[in-house]
Curated annotation (Swiss-Prot):
<dbReference type="GO" id="GO:0005525">
    <property type="term" value="F:GTP binding"/>
</dbReference>
<dbReference type="InterPro" id="IPR031166">
    <property type="entry name" value="G_ENGA"/>
</dbReference>
<feature type="domain" description="KH-like">
    <location>
        <begin position="353"/>
        <end position="437"/>
    </location>
</feature>
<feature type="binding site">
    <location>
        <begin position="119"/>
        <end position="122"/>
    </location>
    <ligand>
        <name>GTP 1</name>
    </ligand>
</feature>
<protein>
    <recommendedName>
        <fullName>GTPase Der</fullName>
    </recommendedName>
</protein>
<feature type="binding site">
    <location>
        <begin position="229"/>
        <end position="233"/>
    </location>
    <ligand>
        <name>GTP 2</name>
    </ligand>
</feature>
<feature type="binding site">
    <location>
        <begin position="294"/>
        <end position="297"/>
    </location>
    <ligand>
        <name>GTP 2</name>
    </ligand>
</feature>
<comment type="subunit">
    <text>Associates with the 50S ribosomal subunit.</text>
</comment>
<dbReference type="InterPro" id="IPR016484">
    <property type="entry name" value="GTPase_Der"/>
</dbReference>
<dbReference type="InterPro" id="IPR006073">
    <property type="entry name" value="GTP-bd"/>
</dbReference>
<feature type="domain" description="EngA-type G 1">
    <location>
        <begin position="3"/>
        <end position="167"/>
    </location>
</feature>
<dbReference type="InterPro" id="IPR015946">
    <property type="entry name" value="KH_dom-like_a/b"/>
</dbReference>
<feature type="binding site">
    <location>
        <begin position="56"/>
        <end position="60"/>
    </location>
    <ligand>
        <name>GTP 1</name>
    </ligand>
</feature>
<dbReference type="Pfam" id="PF14714">
    <property type="entry name" value="KH_dom-like"/>
</dbReference>
<dbReference type="InterPro" id="IPR005225">
    <property type="entry name" value="Small_GTP-bd"/>
</dbReference>
<feature type="binding site">
    <location>
        <begin position="182"/>
        <end position="189"/>
    </location>
    <ligand>
        <name>GTP 2</name>
    </ligand>
</feature>
<comment type="function">
    <text>GTPase that plays an essential role in the late steps of ribosome biogenesis.</text>
</comment>
Length: 437
């Protein structure tokens, strides 16, 4: 399980720019307008052999500054409670503001490592101006420029030097771990209770009554798993109104330590933005995935087209990752709950699939010959053969060709789709690599 780092700060100090710099991506939208980060951005960072998870907490305003400040305070409080280390970003050009002081006051109360980061220090002349941030009472400011990258290497060095070794509480026995994930109050604990016939987890109508990730051994009907409840939220009064960010942080912890993820969504709401956020986290962690539409018993006036309509809506929202099993179930009535575990076992087995090299080439090379990679700037790419890598967590394949750099994402997606058509790879991501031969 990785350490989690949260970036917090008032609007327009460069949180998303720093997030993009550290993750070497353009995942977070960056704009001069305040509040452009409306969804919680999540990614992984690798530095000097250390991998950690990072979250851009964003921040946006609705109607008034007071509501905005309240929202920021909630997110900072959640970060304090759930993240391992906090990067508190301030703006050296505009200096200390009242909102900076409010956030600093919240951070000083907790026994959590806070690294004060003075952003927009694009030249040495601005370094001296960061001295005013000592008044925030959070130690030495690290001068960085997220826009050009200066100082970020030193920041990462200091960051990883303060990581604690994460100990996963998953039992050591080699049994697949299934994380049941989803936004608060979709029925995660109810599903585990229904499967085990035990009131192992506290269940109420209040979102977030599960207090910790709980590993429950399931050993029935020839199936053996550890079921992991992702804990909804563990709310303190001061953060009770903001469950989305909290539940996503908790989901990250369980997703990273699982083999298969069951993403529960609420049938009465279909698939929402928060469901897509968690879906994306599962994809980035390359976990097996099953989507379960819970509370199906609450849908009235169902007809033969109802399931098709729901399934089509889900696949449109999750595209291009559409090769995912979808099960319509009810933890309350126990309808199709055991099918969930049967499919989970199938997905787990698919992740272990080994396809002979001869079979791969016999099927794929004629397809490639019929639909070769596009000619790029007069360069003709010729794929010569393909083989599967061994000792990988998910099915991974290497295509040997003369010009690997000229094969772009759309053609890789074409190859993936062809592989999914010819081999049952439902529910698991696959890796496709190009190598020169």
């Amino acid at each position: 399980m990785n350490n989690i780092v949260a970036i917090v700060g008032r609007p327009n100090v460069g949180k998303s720019t720093l997030f993009n710099r550290l993750t070497q991506s353009h995942q977070a939208i960056v704009d001069e307008e305040e509040g452009t980060t409306r969804d919680r951005q999540y990614s992984k960072v690798e530095w000097c052999g250390q991998i950690f998870s990072i979250i851009d907490t964003g921040g946006w305003v609705l109607n008034s500054d007071d509501i905005f400040e309240e929202e920021i305070n909630k997110q900072v409080q959640i970060a304090i409670e759930e993240a391992d280390i906090i990067l508190f970003l301030v703006d050296v050009i505009h200096g200390t503001t009242d909102l900076d002081q409010q956030i600093a006051a919240l951070l000083r109360r907790e026994k959590k490592l806070v690294i004060l980061v003075s952003n927009k220090a694009d030249n040495y002349k601005l370094y001296a101006q960061s001295a005013e941030f000592y008044a925030l009472g959070l130690g030495d400011p690290y001068n960085v420029s997220a826009i050009n990258g200066s100082g970020t290497g030193e920041l990462l060095d200091y960051l990883i030097s303060n990581f604690t070794k994460k100990v996963d509480n998953k039992p050591e026995i080699t049994i697949p771990a299934i994380a049941i994930v989803g936004k608060p109050n979709v029925g995660k604990s109810s599903l585990i209770n229904a499967l085990t016939n035990e009131e192992r987890n506290i269940v109420t109508n209040i979102a977030g009554t599960t207090r910790d990730s709980i590993y429950t051994l399931y050993d029935k009907f020839g199936l053996k798993f550890y079921l992991v409840d992702t804990a909804g939220i563990c709310k303190k009064k001061k953060v009770e109104e903001n469950s989305e960010y909290y539940s996503i942080i908790r989901a990250i912890r369980s997703i990273e330590s699982s083999d298969i993820c069951i993403l529960l969504i609420d049938a009465t709401q279909c698939i929402m933005a928060q469901d897509i956020n968690i879906f994306s986290i599962i994809q980035k962690n390359e976990k097996g995935l099953i989507i379960v539409v819970n509370k199906w018993d609450l849908i009235q006036n169902k007809n033969p087209k109802t399931i098709y309509t729901f399934e089509n809506a889900i696949r449109q929202r999750t595209a291009p990752f559409t090769d995912v099993p979808i099960i319509f179930s009810s933890a309350q009535t126990k309808k199709r709950i055991y099918k969930i575990l049967q499919v989970a076992k199938e997905v787990y087995d698919i992740r272990q699939i080994k396809i002979p090299t001869s079979q791969l080439n016999r099927i794929l090379l004629p397809i490639i010959a019929k639909t070769p990679p596009p000619i790029n700037k007069g360069k003709v790419v010729r794929i010569k053969y393909v083989t599967q890598l061994t000792n990988t967590i998910i099915p991974s394949f290497v295509f040997f060709c003369n010009l690997p750099k000229w094969i772009k994402t759309p053609y890789k997606r074409f190859l993936e789709n062809q592989m999914r058509k010819n081999w049952k790879l439902t529910g698991t991501p696959i890796n496709i690599f190009m190598r020169e031969k």
